[in-house]
Curated annotation (Swiss-Prot):
CDD domains: PBP2_NikA_DppA_OppA_like_7
Name of the protein described by the UniProt record: Probable D,D-dipeptide-binding periplasmic protein DdpA
Complex formation: The complex is composed of two ATP-binding proteins (DdpD and DdpF), two transmembrane proteins (DdpB and DdpC) and a solute-binding protein (DdpA).
GO cellular component: ATP-binding cassette (ABC) transporter complex, substrate-binding subunit-containing; membrane; outer membrane-bounded periplasmic space
Cell compartments where the protein resides: Periplasm
Taxonomic path: Bacteria, Pseudomonadati, Pseudomonadota, Gammaproteobacteria, Enterobacterales
GO biological process, one term: dipeptide transport
Role of this protein: Part of the ABC transporter complex DdpABCDF, which is probably involved in D,D-dipeptide transport.
Length: 516
């Protein structure tokens, strides 16, 4: 009897399978599945500057302050996260924070001022990209369990806002002590140790990462008991899995896949104004691109509007310079390169040492990068330059860029906090060359001085003048090719509610307040 009972539904299933499409079960209501193109490179907040990594790290840690939510919109203003209050001295050189008394790490131990002190000292000691947001001589003191004092040698205008970025995450001191031999870099590259609403439970490389709620988080309990970040390399596969209900969110889909989803109308495809920009690195540090005339020729050769219309299907706009529209300090009157073959040829004629070929590095990290590379190859061919395309694994490409081993490369950038510092100081300060931000290895003492001046005052009017003056110089020097700023588009299951987009936190989902 048991056999006959088990046989009939099996037989029925076989019959149905041969006559009807397979029905896919929806993801349970208490679970969220996010489809992403690639694994994180590292989960260490003191190392990662990649938004793709922040999908996991941001909800796993807390910081002293966090970005506010204004209704259903993300704000660039900040409010307390671990901090209940703070004050700055009149000269802006001392900042004192009082901690809330109910925050706990995922192992149940309380978050103390000493944890804040150790986390920042580790960040500065490691000295990777995230540390670049903070003064190198920053001093941190913990006079008691609930008080943290930061001392700066000079005013640093964006300081409060830097404390909301991922690098300012507070790490469990017990983990730092247990793995002290390498400053916990090995452990934290693959694990989380924070007090955020979620924590990493498991990571199967190339397959998925699983996040579960931190049982000791004092805030409202999340609606999701499990968040799965599935690694689905092919964009068409991410789109298909979203369409049939296997995943709830498909991240980083190219325009053609988003358009297909819009036509199907099974899921929501939302667009949000973004500060994320795409640009070309031109290696200023070595021949032949150490010649400004050649860099200008490339800038005038680039078909910006063709890329916006063709590659983005109009979902973006050409940049005018390094400070994007929507960020204070933007200069609508700044000189803007456009596709002008006559001007490109005029600059080319000035080039002393004309190259016959250049290399262009890109990866599959962004589906738009390959068509941009092909468009650049076509444009420069008209000047007589053969562009050799090198498609690499993203980690390999980043390594090459960090070493300055390239001619042209491509990247995306989005700010960690709402200040032109994130663009101007990172991209152009001579002490930030390589992966920290100055990926064109640009150096100009006049620009360095203006950028330092912009950090020495909290007077936003004066800071705007300094940044705009520096911007005019770097635009003329054609340090980079400023391509476009893109709207952020996200495809999501219609059942998912409560997502709040913050332009400071692309690819970061507020999974602790979302629901189905």
């Amino acid at each position: 009897m048991k056999r006959s009972i088990s046989f009939r539904p099996t037989l029925l299933a076989l019959v149905l399978a041969t006559n009807f499409p397979v029905a896919h079960a929806a993801v349970p209501k208490d679970m969220l599945v996010i489809g992403k193109a690639a694994d994180p490179q590292t989960l260490d907040p003191a190392v990662t500057i990649d938004n793709n990594d922040w999908t996991v790290t941001y909800p796993s840690y807390q910081r002293l302050v966090q970005y506010k939510t204004d209704g259903d919109k993300g704000s660039t203003d900040v409010e307390g996260d671990l901090a209940s209050s703070w004050k700055a001295s009149d000269d802006q050189k001392e900042w004192t924070f009082t901690l809330k008394d109910n925050a706990k790490f995922a192992d149940g131990t309380p978050v103390t001022a000493e944890a804040v002190k150790l986390s920042f000292e580790r960040l500065l000691k490691i000295g990777q990209g995230p540390a670049e947001a903070f003064p190198k001589d920053l001093k941190i003191d913990a006079p008691d369990e609930h008080t943290v004092k930061f001392t700066l040698s000079q005013p640093f205008a964006p300081f409060l806002y830097t404390l909301a970025n991922d690098g300012a995450s507070i790490i469990n001191p017990a983990v730092l002590k247990e793995h002290a031999a390498d400053d916990a870099r090995g452990f934290l590259a693959q694990n989380t140790a924070g007090s955020g609403p979620f924590m990493l439970k498991s990571w199967q490389k190339g397959q998925q990462l699983v996040l579960v709620p931190n049982p000791h988080y004092p805030g409202n309990k999340p609606n999701f008991k499990r968040v799965s970040v599935k690694i689905i390399g092919e964009s068409a596969s991410r789109r298909l899995q979203l369409s049939r209900g296997d995943i709830d969110i498909a991240d980083a889909l190219p325009v053609d896949q988003l358009n297909a989803l819009k036509q199907e109308n099974k899921v929501n495809v939302a667009e949000y104004p973004s500060l994320r920009v795409t640009y070309l690195y031109l290696n200023n540090s070595k021949a032949p691109l150490n010649q400004a005339d050649l860099r200008r020729a490339i800038s005038w050769s680039t078909d910006y509007q063709g890329m916006v219309n063709g590659i983005l299907s109009g979902n973006g706009k050409q940049m005018r310079g390094p400070i994007p529209e929507g960020m204070w300090g933007y200069d609508a009157t700044a000189m803007q390169y456009n596709h002008d073959e006559t001007k490109a040829k005029a600059e080319w004629d000035k080039v002393t040492s004309k190259p016959t070929s250049l290399t262009f590095l890109y990866s599959d990290n962004d589906p738009n990068w390959e068509p941009i590379a092909l468009a650049t190859q076509s444009s420069l061919n008209k000047l007589g330059i053969i562009v050799k395309l090198e498609k690499l694994a993203n980690a390999t490409m980043r390594d090459r860029v960090g070493k300055g081993d390239y001619d042209i490369a491509i990247g995306n950038w989005s700010p960690d906090f709402a200040d032109p510092y994130m663009f101007m100081n990172y991209w152009f300060e001579s002490d930030k060359k390589g992966l920290p931000g100055n990926r064109s290895f640009y150096e100009n003492s006049e620009v360095d001085k203006l950028l330092r001046n912009a950090l020495a005052t909290t007077d936003q009017t004066q800071r705007t003048r300094d940044y705009q003056q520096a911007q005019k110089i770097v635009i003329d020097d054609a340090a980079y090719v400023y391509l476009f700023q893109k709207n952020y588009q996200l495809a999501m299951n219609k059942e998912v509610k409560g997502f709040v987009f913050n332009p400071m936190l692309e690819q970061v989902f507020n999974i602790n307040t979302m629901s189905k």
